[in-house]
Amino acid sequence: MNLSLKVLDKRGFLKQCTNLEELSTLMDREKIVFYVGVDATSASLHIGHLIPFMVMLHLQRQGHIPIILIGGGTTKIGDPSGKDSMRKILLKEDIDENVKTISSQLLKIIDLSNGGYILNNAEWLDGINYIEFLREVGIYFSVNRMLSFETYKRRLKDGLSFIEFNYQLLQSYDFYMLSRMKNCKLQIGGDDQWGNIVSGVDLVNRKSGNKVFGLTLPLITRSDGKKMGKSEKGAVYLDSELYSVYDFYQYFRNIPDLDVKKFLYLFTFLEEEEIERIASVKGQLLNNAKEILAFEITKIVHGKDEALKASSAAKAAFKGGDGRADIPFFKLELTNLEESILLVDLMVLAKVVSSKSEARRLIDSGGVYIDKVRVGDQNYCLCKDNFINGEIELKIGKKKILRIVL
């Protein structure tokens, strides 16, 4: 197997390939152009999107040429893959803004200065003539075959709109255009994209005669059954305005023990020998491996300086030491404090809980601390005198810390 593919296989990235042997031979012979696509359905990507872009970084390190494709056009349709119902149709203005923010996020992670492209498929999709598209592209698609793919089979039971049914044709056309414009030979995506990717490979092969390939990656799950990329605060976004760098670091610092080695392979560039060494310990000693994992992935997404700050803040919060200023904080307006404020109200205001009832349950269970002192009274109030040097430390359970600042 080609060296680049061996690296991906060893690290747990490979799931399915349209023709692994031929792809390996091609990659032995030349450096290929490949692409990863992502739709602009949100203002930010989350960590569930990271896997294909980690693969992109690995292949780029081996000299292959990446294309980041932002779906400014396909987002107007909505991909039914992995969805139980039709996606909300977004306004064009919102999609355009999402394209800008997602592009900015990805260019912080992937350096294209030495070769590569970032493109928006709206460039060729927005101006399509529907009749011509059906004549030039639609003739290569079999409805029977499309309905054989899991995405469509599952959705047919609950209702599949015609607009979504068109999505596979558009994604396939993307591959055709990238093959024609940039000599792109490989599309990479999550395994839920298998049907779309295979259809794209077939379209390119049949319409242009070019030999291209598709490669899918496993959908990553956690050993505790929680969905990858979700936390108590919601999605773990890559945008630090939506999800702080500290919380991003803490998400990976607090993964289950059983996931440490797997995530070190997936989310870092550490060598195999080092991963095996640092992940071979058990119990409390495994915390060091979690800290390394959290630092490495935070460095990739947010940069080394921000990773150092997050690491320092975590040590200050849980072990003492410098870095306290980098612990996340909530600014409490004096108008909210007045003479005093109930702790349960403050917890809701600071968004560490979603409701007063949740705050009361946490207090009753002994999981709430003010300046390292456990609070056992649901009616506990805070006044200005509690804010020594203008702040207090609110701790929820063992892992969540927030500075409340006046």
Curated annotation (Swiss-Prot):
The keyword Ligase applies. Residues 341-405 form the S4 RNA-binding domain. Its EC number is 6.1.1.1. Keywords: Aminoacyl-tRNA synthetase, ATP-binding, Cytoplasm, Ligase, Nucleotide-binding, Protein biosynthesis, RNA-binding. The keyword Cytoplasm applies. ATP binds at K230. L-tyrosine binds at Y35, Y167, Q171. It is an enzyme of class 6 (ligase). One of its GO terms (cellular component) is cytosol. InterPro entries: aa-tRNA-synth_Ic (IPR002305), Rossmann-like_a/b/a_fold (IPR014729), S4_RNA-bd (IPR002942), S4_RNA-bd_sf (IPR036986), SYY-like_C (IPR054608), Tyr-tRNA-ligase (IPR002307), Tyr-tRNA-ligase_bac-type (IPR024088), Tyr-tRNA-ligase_bac_1 (IPR024107). One of its GO terms (molecular function) is RNA binding. A motif ('KMSKS' region) lies at residues 227-231. A motif ('HIGH' region) lies at residues 40-49. Catalyzes the attachment of tyrosine to tRNA(Tyr) in a two-step reaction: tyrosine is first activated by ATP to form Tyr-AMP and then transferred to the acceptor end of tRNA(Tyr). This is Tyrosine--tRNA ligase. It comes from Borrelia duttonii (strain Ly). The lineage of its organism: Bacteria, Pseudomonadati, Spirochaetota, Spirochaetia, Spirochaetales.
